[in-house]
Amino acid sequence: ITASSVDELEWKCAEMKKLLLSQDMDVQPCSFCQEQAFLSSLPLVSLERSLFERSKRNVLTLGAASCYPFTSYEMCDDNGILLGVNKHNNSLIIVDIFDSRVYKNANIAILGTSGAGKSFSMQLMATRMRRKGIQVFIVAPLKGHEFHRACSNIGGEFIQISPASQNCINVMAIRKVDRSVDEMLDGPGVEKSLLAAKIQRLHIFFSLLIPDMNHEERQLLDDALIRTYARLGITHDNSTLDDPDHPGQYRTMPVLGDLYEVLKESPDTKRLANILNRLVNGSARTFNQQTNVSLDNKYTVLDISELTGDLLTVGMFVALDFVWDKAKENRTEEKAIFIDECWQLIGANSNRLAAEFVLEIFKIIRGYGG
Protein backbone atom coordinates (compact mmCIF):
# COMPACT_ATOMS: atom_id res chain seq x y z
CA ILE A 1 0.00 0.00 0.00
CA THR A 2 1.48 3.34 -1.00
CA ALA A 3 0.39 6.89 -0.27
CA SER A 4 1.66 10.45 -0.58
CA SER A 5 1.36 11.14 3.18
CA VAL A 6 1.27 9.30 6.49
CA ASP A 7 -2.36 10.20 7.11
CA GLU A 8 -3.39 8.92 3.69
CA LEU A 9 -1.39 5.71 4.26
CA GLU A 10 -3.08 5.04 7.60
CA TRP A 11 -6.50 5.66 6.05
CA LYS A 12 -5.80 3.25 3.18
CA CYS A 13 -4.58 0.59 5.62
CA ALA A 14 -7.71 0.95 7.73
CA GLU A 15 -9.96 0.65 4.65
CA MET A 16 -8.06 -2.42 3.45
CA LYS A 17 -8.50 -4.11 6.85
CA LYS A 18 -12.24 -3.40 6.75
CA LEU A 19 -12.51 -4.88 3.26
CA LEU A 20 -10.62 -8.05 4.19
CA LEU A 21 -12.47 -8.49 7.48
CA SER A 22 -15.77 -8.27 5.57
CA GLN A 23 -14.58 -11.34 3.65
CA ASP A 24 -13.60 -13.24 6.81
CA MET A 25 -9.90 -12.61 6.31
CA ASP A 26 -7.71 -11.65 9.26
CA VAL A 27 -4.93 -9.12 8.64
CA GLN A 28 -1.71 -8.89 10.65
CA PRO A 29 0.94 -6.18 10.08
CA CYS A 30 4.41 -7.44 9.05
CA SER A 31 6.46 -4.27 9.08
CA PHE A 32 10.15 -4.61 8.15
CA CYS A 33 9.75 -8.37 7.48
CA GLN A 34 10.42 -8.32 3.74
CA GLU A 35 13.61 -10.35 4.04
CA GLN A 36 12.00 -13.03 6.22
CA ALA A 37 9.03 -13.24 3.83
CA PHE A 38 11.36 -13.66 0.85
CA LEU A 39 13.38 -16.41 2.58
CA SER A 40 10.15 -18.18 3.56
CA SER A 41 9.08 -18.31 -0.09
CA LEU A 42 12.27 -20.10 -1.16
CA PRO A 43 12.40 -23.95 -1.28
CA LEU A 44 14.52 -24.09 1.87
CA VAL A 45 11.91 -25.76 4.12
CA SER A 46 12.32 -22.85 6.50
CA LEU A 47 9.60 -20.53 7.76
CA GLU A 48 10.11 -17.57 10.07
CA ARG A 49 8.37 -18.34 13.37
CA SER A 50 6.84 -14.88 13.72
CA LEU A 51 5.45 -15.01 10.17
CA PHE A 52 4.03 -18.48 10.77
CA GLU A 53 2.17 -17.37 13.89
CA ARG A 54 0.66 -14.45 12.01
CA SER A 55 -0.29 -16.30 8.80
CA LYS A 56 -1.32 -19.80 9.93
CA ARG A 57 -4.93 -20.98 9.53
CA ASN A 58 -6.91 -24.19 9.77
CA VAL A 59 -7.81 -25.72 6.39
CA LEU A 60 -10.25 -28.54 5.64
CA THR A 61 -8.87 -31.48 3.64
CA LEU A 62 -11.17 -30.59 0.73
CA GLY A 63 -9.64 -27.13 0.55
CA ALA A 64 -6.13 -28.52 0.88
CA ALA A 65 -6.76 -30.95 -1.99
CA SER A 66 -7.77 -28.06 -4.24
CA CYS A 67 -4.29 -26.62 -3.80
CA TYR A 68 -2.65 -29.81 -5.11
CA PRO A 69 -1.72 -29.18 -8.76
CA PHE A 70 -2.23 -32.78 -9.99
CA THR A 71 -5.31 -34.89 -10.80
CA SER A 72 -5.47 -38.68 -10.70
CA TYR A 73 -7.88 -40.29 -13.19
CA GLU A 74 -9.30 -43.73 -12.54
CA MET A 75 -12.12 -46.03 -13.69
CA CYS A 76 -13.36 -48.34 -10.97
CA ASP A 77 -17.03 -49.36 -11.32
CA ASP A 78 -18.69 -51.32 -8.53
CA ASN A 79 -19.67 -54.46 -10.48
CA GLY A 80 -17.32 -54.34 -13.45
CA ILE A 81 -14.67 -56.53 -15.03
CA LEU A 82 -10.93 -55.98 -14.70
CA LEU A 83 -9.41 -54.70 -17.94
CA GLY A 84 -5.90 -53.87 -16.76
CA VAL A 85 -3.77 -51.29 -14.96
CA ASN A 86 -3.68 -47.56 -15.63
CA LYS A 87 -0.10 -46.95 -16.75
CA HIS A 88 -0.17 -43.36 -15.46
CA ASN A 89 -1.01 -44.03 -11.81
CA ASN A 90 -1.03 -47.87 -11.52
CA SER A 91 -4.70 -47.93 -10.50
CA LEU A 92 -6.92 -50.84 -11.59
CA ILE A 93 -9.30 -50.27 -14.50
CA ILE A 94 -12.58 -51.98 -13.62
CA VAL A 95 -15.47 -51.22 -15.98
CA ASP A 96 -19.14 -52.20 -15.91
CA ILE A 97 -20.40 -51.21 -19.36
CA PHE A 98 -23.96 -52.22 -18.39
CA ASP A 99 -24.17 -49.60 -15.60
CA SER A 100 -26.73 -47.19 -17.06
CA ARG A 101 -26.12 -44.74 -14.22
CA VAL A 102 -22.62 -44.09 -15.56
CA TYR A 103 -22.81 -44.92 -19.28
CA LYS A 104 -25.57 -44.08 -21.76
CA ASN A 105 -25.16 -47.43 -23.50
CA ALA A 106 -22.89 -50.47 -23.40
CA ASN A 107 -21.39 -50.16 -26.89
CA ILE A 108 -17.60 -50.31 -27.20
CA ALA A 109 -15.29 -49.84 -30.17
CA ILE A 110 -11.77 -51.30 -29.87
CA LEU A 111 -9.40 -49.48 -32.20
CA GLY A 112 -5.67 -49.88 -32.75
CA THR A 113 -2.91 -50.65 -35.19
CA SER A 114 -2.18 -54.15 -36.46
CA GLY A 115 -0.69 -56.24 -33.65
CA ALA A 116 -1.77 -53.83 -30.91
CA GLY A 117 -3.88 -56.50 -29.20
CA LYS A 118 -7.43 -55.69 -30.30
CA SER A 119 -8.54 -59.33 -30.58
CA PHE A 120 -6.83 -60.21 -27.29
CA SER A 121 -8.59 -57.35 -25.49
CA MET A 122 -11.90 -58.45 -26.97
CA GLN A 123 -11.38 -62.05 -25.84
CA LEU A 124 -10.32 -60.89 -22.38
CA MET A 125 -13.54 -58.90 -22.00
CA ALA A 126 -15.62 -61.80 -23.35
CA THR A 127 -14.21 -64.43 -20.97
CA ARG A 128 -14.54 -62.18 -17.93
CA MET A 129 -18.11 -61.28 -18.85
CA ARG A 130 -18.84 -65.00 -19.12
CA ARG A 131 -17.56 -65.50 -15.54
CA LYS A 132 -20.11 -62.90 -14.45
CA GLY A 133 -22.96 -64.84 -16.08
CA ILE A 134 -23.36 -62.57 -19.10
CA GLN A 135 -24.24 -64.36 -22.34
CA VAL A 136 -21.49 -63.80 -24.90
CA PHE A 137 -21.50 -64.20 -28.68
CA ILE A 138 -18.33 -63.76 -30.74
CA VAL A 139 -18.33 -63.51 -34.52
CA ALA A 140 -14.76 -64.14 -35.73
CA PRO A 141 -14.27 -63.59 -39.48
CA LEU A 142 -10.47 -63.78 -39.24
CA LYS A 143 -8.13 -65.75 -36.97
CA GLY A 144 -10.95 -67.81 -35.50
CA HIS A 145 -8.43 -70.30 -34.09
CA GLU A 146 -7.37 -67.69 -31.51
CA PHE A 147 -10.72 -68.13 -29.74
CA HIS A 148 -10.85 -71.93 -29.77
CA ARG A 149 -8.73 -72.74 -26.71
CA ALA A 150 -10.43 -70.25 -24.40
CA CYS A 151 -13.83 -71.38 -25.66
CA SER A 152 -13.04 -75.04 -24.94
CA ASN A 153 -11.57 -74.36 -21.49
CA ILE A 154 -14.67 -72.56 -20.21
CA GLY A 155 -17.13 -75.03 -21.73
CA GLY A 156 -18.27 -72.79 -24.57
CA GLU A 157 -19.70 -73.67 -27.97
CA PHE A 158 -17.32 -73.32 -30.93
CA ILE A 159 -19.20 -73.22 -34.24
CA GLN A 160 -17.14 -73.28 -37.43
CA ILE A 161 -18.90 -72.23 -40.60
CA SER A 162 -16.97 -73.17 -43.73
CA PRO A 163 -17.36 -75.28 -46.89
CA ALA A 164 -15.50 -78.12 -45.14
CA SER A 165 -17.43 -77.93 -41.85
CA GLN A 166 -20.48 -79.93 -40.84
CA ASN A 167 -21.96 -76.93 -39.00
CA CYS A 168 -24.61 -74.99 -40.87
CA ILE A 169 -26.94 -72.04 -40.31
CA ASN A 170 -29.93 -72.04 -42.66
CA VAL A 171 -30.08 -68.44 -43.80
CA MET A 172 -33.69 -68.88 -44.94
CA ALA A 173 -35.00 -70.20 -41.63
CA ILE A 174 -37.54 -68.10 -39.75
CA ARG A 175 -36.49 -68.82 -36.21
CA LYS A 176 -38.95 -69.11 -33.35
CA VAL A 177 -38.20 -66.39 -30.80
CA ASP A 178 -39.59 -66.38 -27.27
CA ARG A 179 -41.46 -63.07 -26.85
CA SER A 180 -43.03 -63.90 -23.48
CA VAL A 181 -40.79 -61.46 -21.61
CA ASP A 182 -41.66 -58.61 -24.00
CA GLU A 183 -45.37 -59.32 -23.60
CA MET A 184 -45.02 -59.41 -19.83
CA LEU A 185 -43.23 -56.05 -19.77
CA ASP A 186 -45.06 -54.18 -22.55
CA GLY A 187 -48.27 -56.12 -23.03
CA PRO A 188 -49.42 -57.65 -26.33
CA GLY A 189 -47.72 -55.90 -29.23
CA VAL A 190 -48.81 -55.24 -32.80
CA GLU A 191 -48.49 -58.41 -34.86
CA LYS A 192 -46.02 -58.05 -37.72
CA SER A 193 -45.38 -60.36 -40.64
CA LEU A 194 -42.36 -62.48 -39.75
CA LEU A 195 -42.06 -63.55 -43.37
CA ALA A 196 -41.78 -59.94 -44.56
CA ALA A 197 -39.09 -59.22 -41.97
CA LYS A 198 -37.16 -62.34 -43.00
CA ILE A 199 -37.34 -61.51 -46.71
CA GLN A 200 -36.07 -58.01 -45.95
CA ARG A 201 -32.96 -59.51 -44.35
CA LEU A 202 -32.58 -62.03 -47.17
CA HIS A 203 -32.33 -59.11 -49.59
CA ILE A 204 -29.25 -57.99 -47.64
CA PHE A 205 -27.82 -61.51 -47.90
CA PHE A 206 -28.28 -61.65 -51.67
CA SER A 207 -26.97 -58.11 -52.16
CA LEU A 208 -23.73 -59.32 -50.53
CA LEU A 209 -23.70 -62.47 -52.64
CA ILE A 210 -24.59 -60.66 -55.89
CA PRO A 211 -23.35 -57.05 -55.56
CA ASP A 212 -24.25 -56.11 -59.16
CA MET A 213 -27.90 -57.15 -58.86
CA ASN A 214 -30.15 -54.55 -60.54
CA HIS A 215 -33.58 -53.29 -59.44
CA GLU A 216 -35.48 -55.64 -61.76
CA GLU A 217 -33.61 -58.66 -60.43
CA ARG A 218 -34.32 -57.57 -56.86
CA GLN A 219 -38.04 -57.52 -57.63
CA LEU A 220 -37.88 -60.92 -59.33
CA LEU A 221 -35.94 -62.28 -56.35
CA ASP A 222 -38.60 -60.94 -54.00
CA ASP A 223 -41.31 -62.77 -55.93
CA ALA A 224 -39.23 -65.97 -55.98
CA LEU A 225 -38.72 -65.83 -52.21
CA ILE A 226 -42.44 -65.45 -51.55
CA ARG A 227 -43.22 -68.40 -53.85
CA THR A 228 -40.53 -70.53 -52.20
CA TYR A 229 -42.04 -70.09 -48.74
CA ALA A 230 -45.58 -70.49 -50.12
CA ARG A 231 -44.72 -73.96 -51.45
CA LEU A 232 -44.11 -75.02 -47.85
CA GLY A 233 -47.33 -73.41 -46.68
CA ILE A 234 -45.76 -70.25 -45.22
CA THR A 235 -47.41 -66.89 -45.98
CA HIS A 236 -47.55 -63.43 -44.42
CA ASP A 237 -50.03 -64.83 -41.90
CA ASN A 238 -47.85 -65.74 -38.91
CA SER A 239 -50.15 -68.61 -37.96
CA THR A 240 -49.00 -70.48 -41.09
CA LEU A 241 -45.56 -70.85 -39.49
CA ASP A 242 -46.87 -73.28 -36.88
CA ASP A 243 -46.37 -76.96 -37.59
CA PRO A 244 -49.74 -78.74 -37.27
CA ASP A 245 -48.00 -82.07 -36.60
CA HIS A 246 -45.74 -80.67 -33.87
CA PRO A 247 -47.53 -78.06 -31.72
CA GLY A 248 -45.26 -75.31 -30.42
CA GLN A 249 -42.80 -75.71 -33.28
CA TYR A 250 -42.41 -74.07 -36.68
CA ARG A 251 -42.73 -75.87 -39.99
CA THR A 252 -39.71 -77.23 -41.80
CA MET A 253 -38.10 -74.20 -43.41
CA PRO A 254 -36.96 -73.94 -47.04
CA VAL A 255 -33.25 -74.04 -47.83
CA LEU A 256 -31.30 -72.33 -50.59
CA GLY A 257 -31.85 -75.36 -52.82
CA ASP A 258 -35.61 -74.74 -52.77
CA LEU A 259 -35.10 -71.15 -53.87
CA TYR A 260 -32.65 -72.34 -56.53
CA GLU A 261 -35.33 -74.56 -58.08
CA VAL A 262 -37.78 -71.64 -58.19
CA LEU A 263 -35.20 -69.32 -59.79
CA LYS A 264 -34.43 -71.89 -62.49
CA GLU A 265 -38.05 -71.92 -63.63
CA SER A 266 -37.88 -68.44 -65.16
CA PRO A 267 -35.36 -67.31 -67.80
CA ASP A 268 -35.37 -63.84 -66.20
CA THR A 269 -33.83 -65.23 -62.99
CA LYS A 270 -31.47 -67.69 -64.68
CA ARG A 271 -28.44 -65.54 -63.82
CA LEU A 272 -29.39 -65.45 -60.14
CA ALA A 273 -29.81 -69.23 -60.16
CA ASN A 274 -26.39 -69.74 -61.75
CA ILE A 275 -24.72 -67.63 -59.06
CA LEU A 276 -26.66 -69.36 -56.28
CA ASN A 277 -25.64 -72.77 -57.67
CA ARG A 278 -22.28 -72.44 -55.90
CA LEU A 279 -24.05 -72.54 -52.52
CA VAL A 280 -26.44 -75.31 -53.58
CA ASN A 281 -24.44 -77.80 -55.64
CA GLY A 282 -20.94 -76.31 -55.67
CA SER A 283 -18.03 -76.08 -53.27
CA ALA A 284 -20.05 -74.10 -50.69
CA ARG A 285 -23.07 -76.41 -50.59
CA THR A 286 -22.72 -76.67 -46.82
CA PHE A 287 -25.01 -73.60 -46.76
CA ASN A 288 -27.76 -75.71 -48.37
CA GLN A 289 -29.07 -77.55 -45.32
CA GLN A 290 -31.11 -77.01 -42.20
CA THR A 291 -29.60 -75.33 -39.13
CA ASN A 292 -27.76 -77.89 -36.99
CA VAL A 293 -26.16 -75.64 -34.34
CA SER A 294 -27.48 -74.04 -31.15
CA LEU A 295 -26.81 -70.74 -29.42
CA ASP A 296 -28.07 -71.78 -25.99
CA ASN A 297 -24.53 -71.88 -24.54
CA LYS A 298 -23.49 -68.85 -22.48
CA TYR A 299 -20.25 -68.51 -24.46
CA THR A 300 -20.54 -69.05 -28.21
CA VAL A 301 -17.91 -68.44 -30.88
CA LEU A 302 -18.88 -68.46 -34.55
CA ASP A 303 -15.71 -69.00 -36.57
CA ILE A 304 -16.06 -68.03 -40.23
CA SER A 305 -12.35 -67.53 -40.88
CA GLU A 306 -12.28 -70.42 -43.38
CA LEU A 307 -14.52 -68.43 -45.71
CA THR A 308 -12.62 -66.28 -48.18
CA GLY A 309 -13.34 -63.64 -50.77
CA ASP A 310 -16.97 -62.74 -51.34
CA LEU A 311 -18.15 -65.57 -49.06
CA LEU A 312 -16.49 -63.96 -46.03
CA THR A 313 -18.91 -61.02 -45.81
CA VAL A 314 -21.80 -63.33 -46.69
CA GLY A 315 -20.88 -65.75 -43.89
CA MET A 316 -20.33 -62.89 -41.48
CA PHE A 317 -23.82 -61.58 -42.15
CA VAL A 318 -25.38 -65.05 -41.77
CA ALA A 319 -23.68 -65.55 -38.39
CA LEU A 320 -24.60 -62.06 -37.18
CA ASP A 321 -28.22 -62.46 -38.28
CA PHE A 322 -28.42 -65.76 -36.37
CA VAL A 323 -26.92 -64.23 -33.22
CA TRP A 324 -29.16 -61.15 -33.41
CA ASP A 325 -32.31 -63.30 -33.40
CA LYS A 326 -31.06 -65.08 -30.29
CA ALA A 327 -30.06 -61.86 -28.53
CA LYS A 328 -33.56 -60.40 -28.88
CA GLU A 329 -35.26 -63.24 -27.01
CA ASN A 330 -35.03 -61.92 -23.44
CA ARG A 331 -34.18 -58.29 -22.93
CA THR A 332 -34.01 -58.66 -19.14
CA GLU A 333 -30.80 -60.71 -19.44
CA GLU A 334 -27.46 -59.04 -20.08
CA LYS A 335 -25.72 -60.15 -23.26
CA ALA A 336 -22.78 -59.05 -25.38
CA ILE A 337 -22.13 -59.46 -29.11
CA PHE A 338 -18.49 -59.11 -30.17
CA ILE A 339 -17.80 -58.58 -33.88
CA ASP A 340 -14.12 -58.99 -34.68
CA GLU A 341 -12.89 -57.19 -37.81
CA CYS A 342 -16.18 -55.29 -38.04
CA TRP A 343 -14.79 -53.13 -40.86
CA GLN A 344 -15.56 -56.04 -43.20
CA LEU A 345 -19.24 -55.10 -42.91
CA ILE A 346 -19.11 -51.33 -42.37
CA GLY A 347 -15.94 -50.23 -44.18
CA ALA A 348 -15.77 -47.83 -47.11
CA ASN A 349 -16.02 -50.66 -49.65
CA SER A 350 -18.69 -52.64 -47.80
CA ASN A 351 -22.30 -53.19 -48.80
CA ARG A 352 -24.63 -50.37 -47.76
CA LEU A 353 -27.46 -52.64 -46.61
CA ALA A 354 -25.11 -54.75 -44.50
CA ALA A 355 -23.63 -51.63 -42.89
CA GLU A 356 -27.12 -50.36 -42.08
CA PHE A 357 -27.96 -53.73 -40.48
CA VAL A 358 -24.91 -53.49 -38.20
CA LEU A 359 -25.84 -49.88 -37.38
CA GLU A 360 -29.35 -51.00 -36.45
CA ILE A 361 -27.94 -53.56 -34.01
CA PHE A 362 -25.56 -50.95 -32.59
CA LYS A 363 -28.41 -48.50 -31.99
CA ILE A 364 -31.11 -50.74 -30.51
CA ILE A 365 -29.23 -53.54 -28.73
CA ARG A 366 -29.33 -51.45 -25.55
CA GLY A 367 -33.08 -52.06 -25.43
CA TYR A 368 -32.45 -55.82 -25.39
CA GLY A 369 -29.99 -55.81 -22.48
CA GLY A 370 -26.88 -55.71 -24.66
Tell what function each PLM region has:
Residues 12-16, 106-109, 121-126, 146, ...:
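Short, hydrophobic/aromatic alpha-helical segments in well-folded domains
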Residues 1-9, 113-116, 305-308:
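A generic structural motif
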Residues 127-137, 154-156:
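Post-Walker A helix-loop "phosphate-sensing" segment adjacent to the P-loop in P-loop NTPases
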Residues 1-37:
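Conserved ASCE P-loop ATPase motor domains encompassing nucleic-acid-directed helicases/translocases
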Residues 107-109, 137, 301:
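Short hydrophobic/aromatic beta-strand immediately N-terminal to the Walker A/P-loop
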Residues 25-26, 36-93, 143-144, 150-156, ...:
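P-loop NTPase motor domains
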Residues 69-125:
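Active-site-adjacent "gating/activation" loops or surface patches in catalytic cores
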